Amino acid sequence: MDHVSSLPEGVLCNIFSFLTTKEAALTSILCKRWRNLLAFVPNLVIDDSVFLHPEEGKEERYEIQQSFMEFVDRVLALQGNSPIKKFSLKFRTDFASHRVNAWISNVLARGVSELDVLVILYGAEFLPLSPKCFKSRNLVTLKINSLGIDWLAGDIFLPMLKTLVLHSVKLCVDKFFFRALPALEELVLFAVSWRDRDVTVSNASIKTLTIKFNYYLGTLSLDTPSLVSFCFSDHVAKDYPLAKMEKLSEARISLLVTEYQIERARAPNIYWVEDDVVLRLVNVGKLMKGIRNVQYLNLSPNTLEVLSKCCESMPLFNNLKSLTIESNERRGWQAMPVLLRNCPHLETLVLEGLLHHVTEKCRNACDCVSQEEKGRSLTSCQVKVLEIKGFQGTTKEMHTIKHFLEHFPCLREIKIHMEENGPTQLRVPEVSQYIAEMMEHYEKSSSCNVQLLVGGYLCKKWTTQ
């Protein structure tokens, strides 16, 4: 007998758990002793692509879809009431089937702790999931993709659920739905289609919240007092009536905007006082107020531009230690002066690109426009470490670095990461030599250590003697 065949049944079942369910079924027929092991495999990974072969156009054939569903029925029947830990289902069909709800009910009744379901219904928007299925004391992780959820808070019972991921889901729930998940710690809302445009996420236990690319979003209310990590990459909501995130430690805000919204953001206020587009941008200030206790903050180019409409309502970020700002030449730094002044304890500033859209409203944060009070917004900033990424070696960038050296009073270290993939002047020997000379010149007139890095490794260092 070979070594694999002599392994204990528990070990063999664990090995089978790393295979797709079809692979496990095919493997089990190789040895007489293995034939019943599929009944005790604790992890079922069922993917219809190994049956339907969509790359060959067979997924639309009715008989193949029927064969797949019959296979799932047989596997679940074979397992009977044996305990199950994980059930993953990926299924494409062109007709709604009650079987999906039956399969989910089966594994929930057997104590499944991790459930991952993707069902694509051809010719219709979403396959509806029955709330009657979702009553379980054991479910810890639930991932739902491309399905319809029309539930009320009282319809479900998931007291142990810690992770909920909703991807491309049609969501028809009331404002109490998330509150009905008492153990929830991680919530992901990705490309969700909301029935009600005014969305409320209310939960006392959530620690990590991700909201990306949602549809039909009107107002957004966040009542998440235990939230620690927040990632928001979405269209600007109409309003943020509630943003309760007192324990927030890290946040990434990446607003999705149209060029029309940017145009209106840059227009003089006097012309758009009553304009709904501008009011929507101004209301972003309420979201910023909600994240004011954050220690680590990342802002996209769009977000920084939108914040130019929130300067008067910009909160104090008293706890902020590290600020990362992404830049590109199509978006401006108008909000930079106010933002830096409102971060009194900032220690690390990371600029992912120095090039940005130049406007007179950049004021004294950069060297783009000559100002009588140049650098005034920087002199009160306590930044000790400045990290610059995507450095291309342009004269404009060099002037900006010089500006920072002259006006950040507490600056002790600058890390400059050279651009490796995009355009750069640093591959030209004459330019590279000029930059080296300028860096040495800057260093002599400051108390700052300057490092030029390539691929994260030190290329050149100028250290104060």
Swiss-Prot record:
SUPFAM superfamilies: F-box domain, RNI-like. InterPro entries: F-box-like_dom_sf, F-box_dom, FBD, FBL60-like, LRR_dom_sf. LRR repeats lie at residues 97-122, 141-168, 198-224, 229-255, 296-327, 328-353. Residues 1-47 form the F-box domain. Keywords: Leucine-rich repeat, Repeat. Pfam families: F-box. Gene3D superfamilies: 1.20.1280.50, Ribonuclease Inhibitor. Disulfide bonds: none annotated. PANTHER family: RNI-LIKE SUPERFAMILY PROTEIN. This is F-box/LRR-repeat protein At1g52650.
